[in-house]
From Swiss-Prot:
Cysteines joined through disulfide linkages: none
Record gene name: dusA
Cross-referenced Gene3D superfamilies: 1.20.120.1460, Aldolase class I
N-terminal signal peptide: none
Protein name: tRNA-dihydrouridine(20/20a) synthase
Annotated positions binding FMN: 14-16, 66, 135, 166, 206-208, 228-229
Reaction catalysed by this enzyme: 5,6-dihydrouridine(20) in tRNA + NADP(+) = uridine(20) in tRNA + NADPH + H(+); 5,6-dihydrouridine(20) in tRNA + NAD(+) = uridine(20) in tRNA + NADH + H(+); 5,6-dihydrouridine(20a) in tRNA + NADP(+) = uridine(20a) in tRNA + NADPH + H(+); 5,6-dihydrouridine(20a) in tRNA + NAD(+) = uridine(20a) in tRNA + NADH + H(+)
Top-rank taxon: Bacteria
Alphabetized SUPFAM superfamilies for the sequence: FMN-linked oxidoreductases
Protein EC: 1.3.1.-, 1.3.1.91
Similarity field: Belongs to the Dus family. DusA subfamily.
Keywords carried by this UniProt record: Flavoprotein, FMN, NADP, Oxidoreductase, RNA-binding, tRNA processing, tRNA-binding
Active-site annotation: 96 (proton donor)
């Protein structure tokens, strides 16, 4: 079926240590339409890794890869590899404020150098056919005026039409990455204003969004919505996405259905030597607000890490839950 909607109408945000390939496979059980993102992977890591950092299951599609870096040549070389592996999109991280990221000269600190960001985006888009997008903040430190944000967008828009805007500024020192996701106030109106002032661009909004109703409200003002922590901690939210946001005529995907659909994948991964805990740690929030959710989490947490833990751990945990 032809999808009449913008491809980024709803996306699950890239989250370091969280949106692994196992997490994405689980999220895909809830929604066929949501755009899923990898964790951020740095360009040098991809180019010099001794093992395959680009591995994913085709069932995860559509899936986008988020890159970290600031060397246009390195990023272009990575982009070619990413496209060859079949990813739907490449996203440049210009939003992460951690010290480790800044020391590598990528993430939110790049907002202070829009010309370099433009060079990076252009270098990648010149060598691939898939979209190259950018995820960024509304400002950094004292560079937080609306004029600064517009100038940043204006320099990059010749090379990318897709901007994912975390509706908070970032402090590059003094706040941890976690604090930078919570302390700077959200300014959704500033993102809405960007869409009004740059109507030709695809503008997606990110930050603090938790419910289907909130998502729908944002979609009256911008092209796409990206949800991070809520999608991870309460993945059952994703079970409503196709029906509510994409007019798909299908029943609600419950957490139990999604977990049961995961069982063959879990068995397959266990047969390849993957530890059970590496998969089910992303499933702990599946039954949030359901009777038995605490027992579900406890049983998985206490047993999935044991030597030889298998599919029976998940099957036993399911018996505790009533939706």
């Amino acid at each position: 079926m032809h999808n009449k909607f913008y491809r980024g109408r709803f996306a699950v945000a890239p989250m370091l240590d969280w949106t692994t390939r196992h997490c994405r496979y689980f999220h895909r059980q809830f929604s066929q339409q949501a755009l899923l993102y990898t964790e951020m992977i740095t360009a040098p890591a991809i180019l010099h890794a001794k093992y395959d950092l680009l591995e994913y299951d085709p069932a995860e599609q559509p899936v986008a890869l988020q890159l970290g870096g600031s060397d246009p040549t390195q990023l272009a070389n990575c982009a070619k590899l990413v496209q060859a592996r079949g990813y739907t999109e490449i996203n440049l991280n210009v939003g992460c404020p951690s010290d480790r990221v800044q020391n590598g000269m990528f993430g939110a600190c790049l907002m202070a150098n829009a010309d370099l960001v433009a060079d990076c985006i252009k270098a990648m888009q010149d060598v691939v056919d898939i979209p190259v997008t950018i995820k960024h903040r509304i400002g950094i430190d004292t560079l937080d005026s609306y004029a600064f944000l517009c100038d940043f967008i204006d320099k990059i828009q010749p090379y990318s039409q897709d901007f994912i805007v975390h509706a908070r500024k970032a402090w590059l020192s003094g706040l941890s990455p976690k604090e930078n996701r919570e302390i700077p106030p959200l300014d959704y109106e500033r993102v809405y204003q960007l869409k009004r002032d740059f109507p030709q661009l695809n503008i997606s909004i990110n930050g603090g969004i938790k419910t289907i109703d909130e998502i729908k409200q944002h979609l009256t003002k911008v092209d796409g919505v990206m949800v991070g922590r809520e999608a991870y901690q309460n993945p059952a939210l994703l079970g409503e996405i196709d029906q509510q946001l994409f007019d798909q005529n299908q029943p609600l995907i419950t957490a139990r259905i999604a977990v049961e659909n995961m069982l063959p994948y879990i068995e397959q991964q266990l047969s390849k030597g993957v530890y059970l805990n590496h998969i089910v740690r992303h499933m702990l929030g599946a039954f949030q607000n359901c009777k038995g959710a605490r027992q579900w989490r406890r049983h998985l947490s206490e047993n999935a890490c044991k030597q030889g833990a298998g599919i029976e751990v998940v099957e036993q945990a399911l018996r505790f839950v009533t939706e």
